[in-house]
Structures are given as structure tokens and as C-alpha cells.
């Protein structure tokens, strides 16, 4: 009996030491990963200043998820605040001294499309994989709108991660945006806005961050443990799409945040999705 107790205690002790060592190493790897410098060569986009382009940028800002992290006025806000985990988007209004105050066109492109700061360090939570396939025209319009916002007070971004998330990130279990993007792809060509597969594919790029490159769903990278997995929205087995009898019922879900049975869907960025116009939502 005493031998068994000693063996058990010894095993537990070894496991505790191993877990502590893994936590230390994982934390160090995470810090190294967040501070690595990535050399991404980008081309600037033209930033227009005409009213039509700025209005297009306003629509993109409202409907492509920007408000969910940066707020409607660009001041930034917390969008994950769960126990030891807090993530807040920074103030991106043209207020003096804020994170984008000195951004040139190349800096915006590198951040939006590639998930890389002007310093070359990776962004942790920016959904650049969603924005990587924006056309040059839409990228320029979005930047133009943000630059047109009135300056408002706000804070820098916050990325506070619990120890398990740091360790998983450090060991590569959670990729940052720069790892999810094919940086060699050229910007896409403009697609006419219409209820077509081509235009739908352009819009569906905004879903990649949560639903994955193939839209087959799964655990949302970097999300809190209480977040549900993103749904499989492809045709076929294990898809949620059979619950929607037609495009109208799916569009209704995008606007209301509710399934056809009336149950609410969690986590989806409905504040943005409800801003989609009738052509885009179809």
C-alpha cells in the first residue's frame, strides 16, 4: 500500500513538474512568436477622397465586422471579456497619437490584408484572412472612410490572454492571422455586385476567420473556451444549411441572429451582418 502511495505521489509530482515546464516554455515561445518580425512586401493602394468612395467605405466598415472590434466611431472596444481573457480593438479614429496616426497606405495594406503591424510584428486577433481578398478599390475605400472619421478619444488595443491560451499559441495550436494567409496572391479583380456565385464568393471571404478557409466550421481560433464551434456552412453532411429552406430564410438569419426555429445564434457578428444590403445578403 505504501509503495502504491509513493508511486502515485511520485507520478503526480512528475506530472506537475512537466506541466509547469510546459507552461514556462509555452509562455516563452508565445512571447517570441508575438515579437517576431515578418517581412511582407506590399504595394500601396490609392486612397480616394470622393463622396461615393467614402460612402462605399462606410458600408464596408459597417457590414464587414469593423464595428464589432473598433466601434462605430472608431474609438475601439472590448469584444472578448471573459475571466482572464480580454481583447479590445484599438482606437483607429484620426485622433493624435493613436495606433494608426502615422499609417501610410502601405501600413494599412499590410495590417488589413496581411495581419502585420508597420513594425513587422504580427497581429494576434485582426481577421486579416477575411480582408486579404478585398479588391484594391474596396481596400482604398475602407481606408478612406476610417481616415474621414471625426477624431475621438479611445484606448490602445488590449490583448490579455490566460495562461492556457498563451501556451497553446506558443506551441502553435492557435495560428495568428499572418499564418493563415497566402501572401503571394495578387489582389482580386472587382466583381459586379449581383446575386451571383462570383459575387457571393467575394463576400464569403469575410466568413473565413471563424468558419475556416473551406467554410466547414470548427473551433474558432483564439476564442474563449465558452464560445461554440463555428458551424459548417458548406453543402453536404454535418452542414447547418439544410435548416434553411431557401435563400430568404438564410438572409433572415443574417439579419435577425435567429435560426428558422427561433433559437438565437451565439458569437456571430450580427451587428455587422444586419447592415448588409439586399443584394449582398442574398
What are these regions (language model features)?
Residues 2-37:
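N-terminal type II signal-anchor transmembrane helix
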Residues 37-62, 171-204:
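Electrostatic cytochrome c docking/interface patches
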Residues 59-71, 90, 107-113, 127-128, ...:
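C-type cytochrome heme c attachment motif
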Residues 62-86, 114-122, 149-154, 201-228, ...:
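Periplasmic/extracellular electron-transfer cofactor-ligation site
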Residues 74-150:
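Membrane-embedded segments
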Residues 87-107, 129-139, 213, 228-253, ...:
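Electron-transfer interface patches adjacent to heme c in soluble/periplasmic c-type cytochromes
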Residues 110-119, 175-182, 186-190, 253-261:
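Short, solvent-exposed interaction modules
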Residues 154-169:
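Extended, well-folded interaction surfaces typified by the phenylalanyl-tRNA synthetase beta subunit core
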Amino acid at each position: 500500500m505504501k509503495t502504491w502511495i509513493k508511486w502515485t505521489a511520485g507520478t503526480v509530482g512528475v506530472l506537475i513538474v512537466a506541466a509547469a515546464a510546459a507552461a514556462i516554455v509555452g509562455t516563452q515561445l508565445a512571447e517570441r512568436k508575438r515579437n517576431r518580425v515578418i517581412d511582407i512586401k506590399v504595394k500601396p493602394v490609392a486612397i480616394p477622397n470622393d463622396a461615393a468612395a467614402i460612402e462605399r467605405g462606410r458600408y464596408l466598415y459597417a457590414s464587414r465586422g469593423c464595428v464589432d472590434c473598433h466601434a462605430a466611431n472608431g474609438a475601439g472596444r472590448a469584444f472578448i471579456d471573459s475571466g482572464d481573457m480580454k481583447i479590445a480593438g484599438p482606437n483607429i479614429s484620426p485622433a493624435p497619437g493613436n495606433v494608426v496616426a502615422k499609417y501610410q497606405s502601405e501600413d494599412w495594406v499590410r495590417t488589413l490584408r496581411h495581419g502585420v503591424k508597420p513594425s513587422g510584428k504580427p497581429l494576434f486577433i485582426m481577421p486579416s484572412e477575411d480582408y486579404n481578398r478585398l479588391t484594391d478599390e474596396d481596400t482604398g475605400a475602407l481606408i478612406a472612410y476610417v481616415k474621414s472619421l471625426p477624431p475621438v478619444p479611445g484606448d490602445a488595443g488590449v490583448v490579455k490572454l490566460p495562461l492556457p491560451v498563451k501556451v497553446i499559441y506558443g506551441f502553435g495550436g492557435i495560428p495568428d492571422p499572418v499564418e493563415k494567409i497566402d501572401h503571394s496572391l495578387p489582389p482580386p479583380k472587382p466583381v459586379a455586385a449581383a446575386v451571383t456565385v462570383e459575387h457571393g464568393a467575394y463576400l464569403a471571404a469575410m466568413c473565413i476567420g471563424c468558419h475556416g478557409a473551406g467554410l466547414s466550421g470548427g473551433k474558432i481560433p483564439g476564442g474563449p473556451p465558452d464560445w461554440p464551434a463555428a458551424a459548417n456552412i458548406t453543402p453536404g453532411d454535418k452542414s447547418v444549411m439544410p435548416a434553411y429552406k431557401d435563400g430568404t430564410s438564410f438572409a433572415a438569419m443574417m439579419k435577425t441572429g435567429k435560426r428558422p426555429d427561433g433559437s438565437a445564434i451565439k458569437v456571430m457578428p450580427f451587428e455587422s451582418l444586419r447592415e448588409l444590403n439586399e443584394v449582398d445578403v442574398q
